[in-house]
Regions:
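Feature for soluble, non-membrane regions of globular proteins
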Residues: 1-212
Length: 212
């Protein structure tokens, strides 16, 4: 059995290009250098705490308060960074065809934002508005009896606070977009939304409605 569950995200397409969102070099640096370093740092930090070795990065981040005060913030930073990136890479598809939400997800977006088109617009504008060095999140609400989606923004590698449950994230650190999009974060956000596996997003929403 592996000692740690801390590994860089593994997109469905490996580390190849995800055009027009990111070229191969950007993806390779993003996964192996940026996230790889976070994984290496976290393994060192939790080495003496076996109870943490089998946990996912998100759970380690949320349970960092159980660790000695001296390393808590470093653990939150490294574990949070890994978790943020897992939500970024989770639904990305490598083919260059445009992907749009299906009927069911479009209905949830309509209920939450007015329409799927309105959601795309709001998401792009929020990405433009945010300063670099954080994440833009699409979340569900744990206290809502009807599935509703909300946007949340976080600085650094922080995760959204309760009652928000992360669904996916947009990385707004410069390493994710600067090479292909410069400062045009609206275009970057649009490219991201059109490379998502919306059927997989739908499956996650269904699982949450069923208590999964």
């Amino acid at each position: 059995m592996e000692r740690y569950r801390i590994t860089p995200p593994q997109p469905a397409f490996g580390c190849g290009a995800c055009l027009p969102l990111a070229d191969r070099q950007t993806m390779d640096v993003h996964i192996h250098v940026i996230v790889g370093r976070l994984c290496a740092d976290l393994r060192v930090l939790i080495d003496g705490f076996p109870v943490m070795h089998t946990l996912e990065a998100e759970e380690i981040c949320r349970r960092a308060f159980q660790l000695p005060r001296l390393i808590r913030e470093d653990v939150r930073f490294s574990a949070g960074g890994i978790a943020c990136h897992e939500y970024y890479f989770r639904y990305l598809m490598a083919d260059e065809e445009e992907h749009l939400p299906g009927d069911r997800v479009s209905e949830v977006l309509r209920r939450s934002f007015g329409s799927a088109d309105s959601f795309f617009y709001i998401f792009r504008e929020e990405a433009k508005r945010m300063q670099t060095g954080g994440f833009l999140w699409l979340c569900t609400e744990s206290r809502s009896h009807v599935t509703r989606l909300r946007l949340a923004s976080t600085r650094g590698y922080d995760l959204p606070p309760a009652p928000y449950l992360p669904l996916l994230s947009l990385d707004l650190w410069e390493h994710a977009y600067i090479n292909r999009f410069g400062e045009d974060r609206r275009a970057y956000a649009d490219a991201f939304l059109r490379r998502l596996n919306w059927d997989a997003v739908d499956a996650t929403l269904t699982a949450r409605e069923c208590g999964g």
